[in-house]
Amino acid sequence: MEGEGSRVVALYDGNGAITETKKSPFSVKVGLAQMLRGGVIMDVVNADQARIAEEAGACAVMALERVPADIRAQGGVARMSDPQLIKEIKRAVTIPVMAKARIGHFVEAQILEAIGIDYVDESEVLTLADDANHINKHNFRIPFVCGCRNLGEALRRIREGAAMIRTKGEAGTGNIIEAVRHVRSVMSDIRVLRNMDDDEVFTFAKSIAAPYDLVMQTKQLGRLPVVHFAAGGVATPADAALMMQLGCDGVFVGSGVFKSGDPAKRARAIVQAVTHYSDPEILAEVSCGLGEAMVGINLSDTNVERFANRSE
């Protein structure tokens, strides 16, 4: 488990560390994402839920028409949310508001930027718009969030301009197993990378199809060059604390809050669990009396669609 001091993220562009006198547009976006470090980002579908999330202590909300559990249950094509809904949620809260765009759908991202969204999540939870290309995130002023299952995928998204990385997990399932698998994969590769010499790093970068300079930066930092949040299946305070103890910088919570018996109480408990993730006594206290958790999905069922596998 990492200490708090080791969670400070250096700012990097393609040429190395950025100093105060040399601020690139990308470094500004990475800095905005760092402001969310140590926090909880909650999915909401209306202004009332957004207010509950803010009162519970969420650092940001994700504005959606349907939470991932409903996307799974209802099927169909999942697209960017109605801009009117996003505007209503923005008016209801003072914390940052995120919204999702389909992978590769740069026009959805342009619309979200035009209405003043704070962050865009290029998300595999929505139906793919382009199965070969992600959005060139350097073309936008606002920070982007992208998902990953492993280190190579994370660094490819950062090269495209992602200012925050999250584990993909399996959103809408209430099942943490895939998120744990993905964060352990990233952390394991970083531990191995730190002990490599330069020749080995070059070969390793090719093997994971990642940019060599970003692999070297990751080796030097001992972590990803941007903030790294957990997402996908976080449903309880214990789930949230687990992801923090595994080394994540914060947590996304989707269906796990507003598909539970007492959303307001569970939201507060998850925020407290992220803040006090290394204190079992506080974790035990905040886990009591939360009501029924979301039912969830057993991922051993072969009929379950894997959102995480929708893109590379």
Curated annotation (Swiss-Prot):
InterPro entries: Aldolase_TIM, PdxS/SNZ, PdxS/SNZ_N, RibuloseP-bd_barrel. The active site is at K100. Pathway: Cofactor biosynthesis; pyridoxal 5'-phosphate biosynthesis. D-ribose 5-phosphate binds at D43, G172, G233, G254, S255. GO terms for biological process: amino acid metabolic process; pyridoxal phosphate biosynthetic process; pyridoxine biosynthetic process. Keywords: Lyase, Pyridoxal phosphate, Schiff base. PROSITE patterns: PDXS_SNZ_1 (PS01235), PDXS_SNZ_2 (PS51129). It is an enzyme of class 4 (lyase). The keyword Cell cycle does not apply. GO terms for molecular function: pyridoxal 5'-phosphate synthase (glutamine hydrolysing) activity. D-glyceraldehyde 3-phosphate binds at R184. Disulfide bonds: none annotated. Its EC number is 4.3.3.6. It catalyses: aldehydo-D-ribose 5-phosphate + D-glyceraldehyde 3-phosphate + L-glutamine = pyridoxal 5'-phosphate + L-glutamate + phosphate + 3 H2O + H(+). Gene3D superfamilies: Aldolase class I. Pfam families: SOR_SNZ (PF01680). Induction: By wounding, gibberelic acid and 1-aminocyclopropane-1-carboxylic acid (ACC), but not after treatment with methyl jasmonate or active oxygen species. HAMAP family: PdxS. PANTHER family: PDXS_SNZ N-TERMINAL DOMAIN-CONTAINING PROTEIN (PTHR31829:SF6), PYRIDOXAL 5'-PHOSPHATE SYNTHASE SUBUNIT SNZ1-RELATED (PTHR31829). Vitamin B6 is an essential quencher of singlet oxygen in plants, that can protect cellular membranes from lipid peroxidation. Catalyzes the formation of pyridoxal 5'-phosphate from ribose 5-phosphate (RBP), glyceraldehyde 3-phosphate (G3P) and ammonia. The ammonia is provided by PDX2. Can also use ribulose 5-phosphate and dihydroxyacetone phosphate as substrates, resulting from enzyme-catalyzed isomerization of RBP and G3P, respectively. Also plays an indirect role in resistance to singlet oxygen-generating photosensitizers. Belongs to the PdxS/SNZ family. This is Pyridoxal 5'-phosphate synthase subunit PDX1. The lineage of its organism: Eukaryota, Viridiplantae, Streptophyta, Embryophyta, Tracheophyta.
